[in-house]
Amino acid sequence: MDVERLQEALKDFEKRGKKEVCPILDQFLCHVAKTGETMVQWSQFKGYFIFKLEKVMDDFRTSAPEPRGPPNPNVEYIPFEEMKERILKIVTGFNGIPFTIQRLCELLTDPRRNYTGTDKFLRGVEKNVMVVSCVYPSSEKNNSSSLNRMNGVMFPGNSPGYSERSNVNGPGTPRPVNRPKVSLSTPMTTNGLPDSTEHKESSLQQTEDKKHSDSPASDSEGAQSSPVKNKHSEDDPAEAEGHEVKRLKFDKEGEARDAPNQSASSEVSLGMGEESETSSTSQDKEKDSICARQHCTEEDEEESFMSPRNAGPDRKDQEKDTESSTVNEESSEENQMEESDQSQAEKDLHSDNSESSGSVSSGADCSETEELGSYGSETPETSSETPMENSEEATEVADEPMEQD
């Protein structure tokens, strides 16, 4: 449909003093009823639309009089003139094209298509008129790309013509909200704002700081774990020495006799002081006493298994020997306890003195170790003679009852 011809026809209708139906304008209303496209502004065809609406309502009443029966009790009865004035008042108050313009044009061009009674027709028109949302001509929508409409409400861009068409239908209607567009190509933060370069740089710095903080932490953990391992390595030899000492106490007689000679030779080779040699002699004495105790226990067991026949004077001699051996054992135990205490104190002193005497010349150390070695070799011989004599006496006592049998 030609827009220029339409605008000329509308101007001619406004100039006429007597309002009459125009075929061109009726064709325009039919076009809107079919397509919903309004090619001109509301101010231009508002007069003809009101004229056509009033004429259709009057014609509908004359052709279809009011029903003779009683009105519907569930619906409020409103006289025709009152309803007509209400509808015309609402339409004249429009500042823009109502979004129901297509349905209204259908009612104007073909009023009897869906309605037969006048009251129902007026209620249908009133229902489509009582709206506030508005639309704009399709020509403006095609020409201005910045105009956006959602549910009949236009969200403007930067169009200069929007200020003239800012009002919508009805009193107290809120103005459309001007919402800025945000491009989705840029990354969004948690609060909906675009992520800036400063934020990216700060995040990169934070990640780098975390990496640097993690690396020293791992180094410190390694440093902490290494001294713990060193402590365990230092404690292991001490525990091993303790186990070796316990093992030596429970060895057999031959191993107990060979151990003093090996310990003396190792001490001479290492250049230990007098305190270490005295402690080794005390250990030798302890081992000899342990061997003597083992012999005594074996003799007691043999005596317990002897027959009652030999319970005569030989038993008395054996009891005397055992009493003397027990007295010797008690005295030797006391001496061993005292010597062990002295040896521990001497070991502590030697550990302190050995740290301070690390700078002594090697020649003096060798001379002292040779003298102490000779002294140490004499002392085990003397100590070893005493348990040997005790063991010989014990074997003689054990052999006498065997001869009597």
Curated annotation (Swiss-Prot):
A Pfam family that the UniProt record links to this protein: PPP4R2
Listed Low complexity bias regions: 354-366, 377-389
Any single Gene Ontology cellular-component annotation: protein phosphatase 4 complex
UniProt biased composition (Acidic residues): 330-341, 390-405
Location of region: Disordered: 140-405
UniProt feature, compositional bias: Polar residues: 140-149, 160-170, 183-194, 215-228
GO molecular function: protein phosphatase regulator activity
InterPro entries in UniProt: PPP4R2
Comp. bias regions, Basic and acidic residues: 196-214, 231-258, 312-323, 344-353
Family: Belongs to the PPP4R2 family.
PANTHER family noted in UniProt: PPP4R2-RELATED PROTEIN, PROTEIN PHOSPHATASE 4 REGULATORY SUBUNIT 2-RELATED
Subunit structure: Serine/threonine-protein phosphatase 4 (PP4) occurs in different assemblies of the catalytic and one or more regulatory subunits.
Function: Regulatory subunit of serine/threonine-protein phosphatase 4 (PP4).
Protein name: Serine/threonine-protein phosphatase 4 regulatory subunit 2
UniProt source species: Gallus gallus
